């Protein structure tokens, strides 16, 4: 039930390759559209990736293509978020904000796998994807709400 270690490592590698390859295109897009909107789209890609992946698991080429695309876009959450941080803070405040950003990102790397593992335990083999999709949906919804609040207060 599920993939072995070698296959799982290939999946992680595919997502990581996407994260590397998509840095420049996402940066280019971030220079041309509203960065908050791009951040919401990157977060929402987590929902789409989680929804599409079960349909391509039996077609390795399609699955790795989806994982490269998904990894590239979802990893843009960090990059675009960091760009927004740089827009908002300057000087010593930027250093403090960056430290807080890294700390919160690290907390997500601790809490996320716990939630994902619980999802996998609860609904094997789809629980991991359900958890990833739910986390991404919650983050995208939070970002959209925050963007709406900022636009209403302007």
Describe every region a protein language model picked out.
Residues 130-154:
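Multi-pass alpha-helical transporter architecture, strongest
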Residues 10-19, 101, 105:
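Transmembrane alpha-helical segments of major facilitator superfamily
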Residues 91-121:
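A late C-terminal transmembrane helix in Major Facilitator Superfamily
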Residues 16-24, 109-110:
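Residue-level signature of mid-helix packing/kink "hotspots" within the transmembrane helices
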Residues 22-34, 120-121:
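Helix-to-loop junctions at the C-terminal end of transmembrane segments
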Residues 118-136:
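A membrane-interface helix-boundary motif in multi-pass transporters
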Residues 75-89:
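Intracellular juxtamembrane helix-capping segments at the cytosolic ends
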Residues 37-52, 133:
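Structural signature of the two symmetry-related core transmembrane helices
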């Amino acid at each position: 039930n599920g993939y072995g270690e070698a296959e799982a490592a290939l999946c992680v590698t595919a997502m990581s390759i996407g994260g590397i390859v998509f840095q420049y295109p996402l940066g280019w897009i971030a220079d041309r559209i509203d960065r908050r909107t791009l951040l919401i789209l990157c977060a929402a890609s987590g929902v789409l990736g989680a929804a599409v992946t079960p349909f391509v698991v039996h077609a390795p080429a399609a699955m790795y293509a989806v994982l490269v695309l998904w990894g590239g876009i979802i990893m843009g959450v960090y990059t675009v978020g960091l760009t927004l941080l740089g827009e908002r803070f300057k000087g010593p405040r930027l250093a403090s904000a960056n430290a807080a950003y890294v700390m919160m990102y690290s907390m997500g790397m601790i809490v996320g796998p716990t939630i994902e593992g619980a999802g996998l335990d609860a609904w094997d083999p789809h629980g991991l994807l359900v958890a990833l999709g739910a986390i991404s949906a919650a983050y995208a919804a939070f970002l959209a709400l925050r963007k709406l609040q900022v636009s209403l207060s302007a």
